[in-house]
Amino acid sequence: DNISGTMGHKNLLSSILFLTLPFVIYLIRVGKKLWRLLSIVLLACMLLIILQTQTRAVFVALGLFVITIAIVYKSQIKLKQLSLLLVSVIVGLSLFFTILKYTERYDAFVHEIHTALDYKNSLRYKLYKSSFYLISENPLLGVGPGNWKVKIPKYGLYFGSFGTNYAQRPHNDFLWVFAEGGLIPGISFILIFLILLRDSYYLHKNNKESTFFYSLLFATFIGFSFISFFDFPLERFSHNIIFFFLAAIIVAGKLRHTGYKKELLPKWLSFSFLGIIFFVIYVAIIRYQGEVYATNAINSQAEQDWTSVVEDIDKAY
């Protein structure tokens, strides 16, 4: 039941593959023969990996993606295309269950479904409930960046547990931002998604040259908002880079379509942005080093080398 990869977490691997879907699908439609063939092969590999990782949030996000595209183009879908879609879904589900049986992950998948249905006894429900208590006591300013995992034991997350597992985040980016940043960052994070959804749909309706690509982005943002609600892609820089790259495409497209006035920024503002960039780079380096030492500590723990565990944890902080 073990899966090996370079992303460090199977859910994060699936979610970053989902974020790249619009580029691959767009190339299948507009690319030349070689690029189209390569894109089809790449899409098949991506879907196969997503099936193998069994990330439920991404499964639902894929369903939302397909449903959104179907609704957006409902007037253009013909019976032949609908039949092809249904056949593809049936083939995909058949392939999925075949993979489950072949890799002996069927029982694990059924267990995950039962866990999801019995949500009140699940760890995720406890995460959300404790996070709501934390937010209710710190609604304006939050508890500060990186402090969710420090403050959350106070709100009953580990009551009745044996201390063998410790959560680093609430498995919900929206709750995470609210809990650590407070009201303004929490609302701002929600507004980012709402604005991107509004503008991507606007560009789909009004930009005839790239209407298909913007519809893909619209469906991607809907799916990714669901993933962010049940997972933690905000934790990884790789996800943030791709997400804000997609956001930049939407912002640039909206500015080109509606028009804008060029203005020179004051020098002090330019230097302020430069300072923020250097600070972000510094934080990224610190976090990267922390991840390296944390990984070393986990490996040392597996080898029961407790001296190295303490040393690596000290270096991680």
Q: What is the predicted function of each stretch?
A:
Residues D1-T6, F65-V66, F96-S136, P153, ...:
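Flexible juxtamembrane loops connecting transmembrane helices in multi-pass membrane enzymes
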Residues G182, N207, Q304-D305:
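Short helix-adjacent coil turns
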Residues K261-L269, G275-V292:
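TPR-adjacent "capping" and linker segments in tetratricopeptide-repeat scaffold/adaptor proteins
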Residues D1-Y102, A179, S188-E209, F213-F229, ...:
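Alpha-helical transmembrane segments of multi-pass inner-membrane proteins
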Residues Y155, F162, I286-Y317:
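Soluble catalytic regions of membrane-associated enzymes that act on cell-envelope
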Residues L51, F97-E104, L141-V143, V150-S161, ...:
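Membrane-interface helix-loop junctions at the exits of transmembrane helices
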Residues H9, Y125-A167, F174-V177, G181-S188:
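TM-adjacent membrane-interface loops and short helices in multi-pass inner/ER membrane proteins
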